[in-house]
Each structure stands twice: as C-alpha cells, then as structure tokens.
Amino acid sequence: MGRMHSRGKGISASALPYKRSSPSWLKTTPQDVDESICKFAKKGLTPSQIGVILRDSHGIPQVKSVTGSKILRILKAHGLAPEIPEDLYHLIKKAVAIRKHLERNRKDKDSKFRLILVESRIHRLARYYKKTKKLPPVWKYESTTASTLVA
C-alpha cells in the first residue's frame, strides 16, 4: 500500500525479534521497567522516546516482552498518558511550524500546499481517534489554537 501524499511505498521497517519472551540475559524486573517508564514520562518524554532510551541506554529490547504490556498502556495505568495521541501531536506541531514559516514567507506556494496536506491528515486522524474514543467527541482542530496545544 502506498503513502497518502507522496510516491513512497513504505516497505522498510525494523525487524522484530522472533521470540516474544524476555531475553535470558536481561536481569531487569518488570517493576524496574515500570518505574523507569514513569520516571521518563514525568520528565516529559513521549512513549516512543521512552522506548528508544530503554532500548539504547538500558538494554531493554522490547518493553512488552519484559512487562507484558506496552509503554502507553503502562502510562495510562499510572495516569501519565498524553491527552493527545503522539502521532496527532506531531502532525499539529508540523502544521504550526509551517504556519510560522508562512507568516514570514507569504509567497511560498509549496508550503501552502503542504500545509493543506498536513491539515487534511490531522482531520482524518482526529476523525479516527474520535471514532475509537481516544479523543473526546467535541475535540476539534483549529489552526488559531493549535500553537497552545503544542506549547
């Protein structure tokens, strides 16, 4: 299946480990992993950033194989989950950056077009998250208040 607004096919992906169980060389307990996830979330890191730090610095290849649940589910259990889903947050952040660029460069027609594409992705994703009840049904993306969502 192709990408939404580009020519790419999206074939490349990271290789998941074959075994779903925790590695034998890993001596970290699930409670330690939970505590470190909560510690990183309180610092303001996103779930994907937490996963990268745990993989690179702490030697935990996959949180789900150690704890039995994913990072976002652990954050929800402790009440630390972000109010806006991460992918929607990054799209809003990108739209705010493009709007800021367009304030300085009014004649940049390509950026205007890209802003339309990004905002259509935001609306499509918001519709999905409202349907799956990850966003409240009255939530609405507005370009005027978007910078307060990201700040």
From Swiss-Prot:
InterPro entries: Ribosomal_uS15, Ribosomal_uS15_arc_euk, Ribosomal_uS15_N, uS15_NS1_RNA-bd_sf
Pfam families: Ribosomal_S13_N, Ribosomal_S15
Family annotation (Gene3D superfamilies): 4.10.860.130, S15/NS1, RNA-binding
GO molecular function, one term: structural constituent of ribosome
Gene Ontology annotations for the cellular component aspect, listed alphabetically: cytosol; cytosolic ribosome; cytosolic small ribosomal subunit; nucleolus; plant-type cell wall
PANTHER family found in the cross-reference section: RIBOSOMAL PROTEIN S15P/S13E (PTHR11885), SMALL RIBOSOMAL SUBUNIT PROTEIN US15Y-RELATED (PTHR11885:SF25)
Similarity section: Belongs to the universal ribosomal protein uS15 family.
Name assigned to this protein: Small ribosomal subunit protein uS15z
Gene: RPS13A
